[in-house]
């Protein structure tokens, strides 16, 4: 359906950036293995919690053979006081070729927000792509 699946750690602990690289790598690999067992999908895509990177994260990414994926548009959809319309407007103002939009699927109304964003992209003449397409690679 045009999706690429990646991992985001096993536990999403707020202290993730402060862990030792070995502990980070263990969480990445545990999540990767669970995903493979459940879906059959092998992935090397990884987004660190909160988008925080540092030398320890870089070591864990290298150790696990992962590719770190960030974003170029932070939607701020996790802020409770923001309406879907305000989030969509923020994204619209920042659109451009090759942009990666950060959205969360566990928020109330996430499906409606995604529909709004996709409509805005279509109206703006943009097309969606997976991060694999942006990386120009076939591997999910």
Can you annotate each of these PLM segments?
Residues 1-102, 106:
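Metal-dependent polysaccharide deacetylase catalytic core of the NodB/CE4 family, i.e.
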Residues 109-140:
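C-terminal domain-boundary segment and adjacent tail
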């Amino acid at each position: 359906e045009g999706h690429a699946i990646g991992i985001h750690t096993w536990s999403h602990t707020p202290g993730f950036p402060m862990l030792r690289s070995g502990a980070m790598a263990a969480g990445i690999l545990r999540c990767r293995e669970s995903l493979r067992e459940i879906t059959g999908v092998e992935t090397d895509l990884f987004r660190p919690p909160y988008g925080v990177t540092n030398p320890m994260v870089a070591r864990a990414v290298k150790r696990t053979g992962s590719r770190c994926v960030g974003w170029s548009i932070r939607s701020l959809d996790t802020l409770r006081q923001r309406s879907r319309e305000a989030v969509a407007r923020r994204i619209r103002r920042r659109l451009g070729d090759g942009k990666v939009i950060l959205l969360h699927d566990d928020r109330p109304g996430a499906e409606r927000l995604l529909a709004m964003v996709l409509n805005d992209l279509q109206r703006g003449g943009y097309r969606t792509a997976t991060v694999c397409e942006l990386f120009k690679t076939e591997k999910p």
